[in-house]
Amino acid sequence: MRSGLFGVLRWTAVGLVATLVASLALTACSGSAAGEIVYVVDGALGTYNTNTIVGAASAGAQAFARTLIGFGYHGPDGQIVADHDFGTITVVGGVPLVLDYQIADNAVYSDGKQVTCDDLVLTWAAQSGRFPGFDAATQAGYRDIANIECLAGQKKSRVFFVPDRSVVDYEQLFAATSMMPSHVIADQLNIDVTEALLTHNATLVEQIARLWNTTWDLKPAVDLRRFPSSGPYKIESVLNGGAVVLVANDRWWGLKATTKRITVRPQEADIQDRVNNRSVDVVDVAVGSSGSLATPDNYARIDSPSAGIEQLIFAPQGLLAAAAARRALALCTPRDVVARDAGLSIANSRLSPATEDAIAAADGAREAGQFSKADPAAAHDALSGETLPVRIGYQGPNARLAATVGTIAKACAVAGISVSSVTLDSSTDPSGPQALRDGKIDVLLASTGGATGSGSSGSSSMDAYDLHTGNGNNLSGYANAQVDNNIGALAVSADPAERVRLLADSAPVLWADMPTLPLYRQQRMLLMSKTMYAVTRNPTRWGAGWNMDRWALVR
């Protein structure tokens, strides 16, 4: 989503107001500001790099939105807000699109190394699809960049887009959590990363990709020198059980973090006990994932729609690789019941999923009609009377998704489809997408991109790449030239009429091939202490963590 001057001013004002409110609260209340806040998120925190397939599906973006910053961040409505603490973007040319990126002169990592244009080059190379070996979640936007001019060690770069590929939502690129510290890889390999990438040195590119994929994996006793921060917080430690402790970054050049320490903890089965004994302060998870979580008197709860769609994502291999098998499971899935149990309407859109508007509502509505209610007879016929065992997996614990699998299993049994539920424990199976890729399950029940949380970038044209050939989080391995062309066209079109045409052209193909089955829009629950200040919702995968450096808890 592009943000105009009004949007930038509006959300800059929101940040200032949040800071002012927190300051006034601390002044007015008899209590004092807490030194630590405990923040509970949906999924695992297995990597610092939220741009890998596993990282994008994790809760990493919620945790590290103010640890690895960029030229923009996602505000409370999911829109991009320019982050001038980090730098500025200037449009130099429109056709083709040319952008100048200027990193702030005082931008420095927590280890003392400068933030430079080398970080942009690595970000582009890893996610452009042009360099082999990178396990990137998405190529959206980056694949349309033709070249980046960067003198190693400098703070300015010029980005040239491919002619006729003026990406509408270019502000999504090089934003918070997208830019990893390239000097960490440069120091490990003792090379100039920018030179190696821009000269396409195949041997070095392979080594760079391997480290980009793995060097930022998080585990207890990890070498924290590999995890420098460019934001108000930095990692202090990784705890047993997967929690990550963030502390104020003393080298941060902007407004200092209000709270000095935030422990980010993945949701566990004992969440109700933790809330009851006030050992957690902010809970930012999918509605229903924690069951019927009771809200104590000293907590406030806000539910709101996310930009992500809960869906069935079919494996590219095994029994569900065949379109007939996928359609059979879709035919017996009672989407109306599943959505009703979640208190929601059925979602149909695959290529316009991030927002609830007239365009998204119309996307695929006609083609989806036969898949709204369970039709076990049609499912049986689609399989020619054969039986079909199906393993549906989801990241647990998650009461809502467990119930959904049970509903599908009951409805599909009549059709000869035996559905078994597979709970993926974050301690042993940290990634639903990885389990799907490894063949441990036939279907992944998750949100956009296979995420436990929202999973969405906040931009429908970016999220649509989940079904583009070769995209990392195209978990079903779907490939269709017509759909690819339409996804590419959506990324460069701001014309509503053209977008409607492209969606209408894609819907019959997608509902026939059935790479995924959308169910309903994931709802988010934000539960917090009544003495918490400046915590606000966010429909994207960055969640409430988008402004955690402004949070204040009064004891």
UniProtKB/Swiss-Prot annotation:
Localization of this protein: Cell membrane
GO cellular component, one term: plasma membrane
Gene3D superfamilies, A to Z: Dipeptide-binding Protein, Domain 1 (3.90.76.10), Dipeptide-binding Protein, Domain 3 (3.10.105.10), Periplasmic binding protein-like II (3.40.190.10)
Gene Ontology terms describing biological process: peptide transport
Signal peptide: 1-28
Keyword Membrane: yes
UniProt topology in membrane: Lipid-anchor
Superkingdom field: Bacteria
Keywords of the record: Cell membrane, Lipoprotein, Membrane, Palmitate, Signal
Covalently lipidated residues, kind N-palmitoyl cysteine: 29
Molecular function, one GO term: peptide transmembrane transporter activity
UniProt cross-references to PROSITE patterns, sorted A to Z: PROKAR_LIPOPROTEIN
Entry annotated with the keyword RNA-binding: no
SS bond list: none
Lipid group attachment sites (S-diacylglycerol cysteine): 29
Pfam families listed in its UniProt record: SBP_bac_5 (PF00496)
Family indicated by similarity: To M.tuberculosis Rv2585c and M.bovis Mb2616c.
Protein name: Uncharacterized lipoprotein ML0489
Top-level taxonomy: Bacteria, Bacillati, Actinomycetota, Actinomycetes, Mycobacteriales
